[in-house]
Structures are given as C-alpha cells and as structure tokens.
C-alpha cells in the first residue's frame, strides 16, 4: 500500500509461493515476500522496511506523521505470534487437526484487540483523528484475524475496531493494491 500511495515506480511480479522463481531466491534466499530490488541492487525483503522506505521517498498523504512504531511493533510481534497460532494451529501443535484453530491464542490476541478497540472508541484512528501509517501497517493483520471465524468476529466486543477495519478494507487504495495480477515466471520480461 505504501508503494502504491508513494507513487514509486516498480515492477509487480505475482508468484505462487510454493513455486518460487529462481530469480526471487537468488535475490532473497529466505524465500518470503516481498522481495524488492532497488536500482542500486540493495534488496528489501521485509514488508515494514519496504513500506517505510517507500514513504520516505514520497509521503503524499502524510502517513508518517504521528506514526507509532511501538504500536506497530506490538502488532508485528505479540499479535502476529498469536494470530499465526490461532489461525494455523496445526503448524504449531502436532496434535491439532488441519484447519483447527487454537482458542488459547485467540484469547491472548483478544487482549491486544481490546486495547485497539479502546483507542478507536476515543479517536477515528489508532493514534488520533488522522489516518497514518500505524493504521495502514496494522489493519491487514486485523483483517486476517477477522477472517478466521467471521461469525465470532461479528459478535466480538470490538465494534469500533470492526468499523475501522471495514473503512480500511473498503478504501480505494486497498482495493487498488488487491487487484489480481497475472502470474509471473522467470521466462518473462518486465510486466
């Protein structure tokens, strides 16, 4: 989203993670997305690093104003830890059935969700009355969490958080970056 909003000129390559192109693995052997190769050859392969780099190049919406790095760190650390174990229980617990969820991790994530909901009961956005990169960095993870058990999510005691999430999911910039792209392969030239 930050790349899109910043107006950065880049080539988007859509891949299937189970069939990673050799060129991707050459650029970033860890084999995760994103992989962004700057003009000088430097590779950025962490989402947060890439977003911050893009916004430092151009921040037309002022998303870095009021950015709360500590709140994003809580999201990327403890919340993501519990989200992954809630959503993908069988990856972390050999006794969990495929597709099972881990309610103990949902409960731990709910503590963080409650804190976010409390913020949003006071303000329109996580750090105040203006949207900034804190909101943009966090909402995709809340979207993932909400999609695990949608009926539960709709009944959960987080109305302000649900409204905030709906606003972000329906935003034009999000719809633009979620547009489907054709699959890319090493045999192709730039898209």
Language-model features and meaning:
Residues 26, 170, 179:
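Phosphate-coordinating loops and pocket residues in cytosolic domains that bind phosphorylated ligands
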Residues 71-170:
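GST-like fold's C-terminal all-alpha helical module
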Residues 1-103:
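GST-like domain detector, emphasizing the conserved glutathione-binding G-site
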Residues 49, 160, 173:
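Residue-level recognition of oxygen-bearing side chains
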Residues 180-191:
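Long, charge-rich low-complexity segments
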Residues 14, 179-180:
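Short loop/turn and capping residues at structural boundaries
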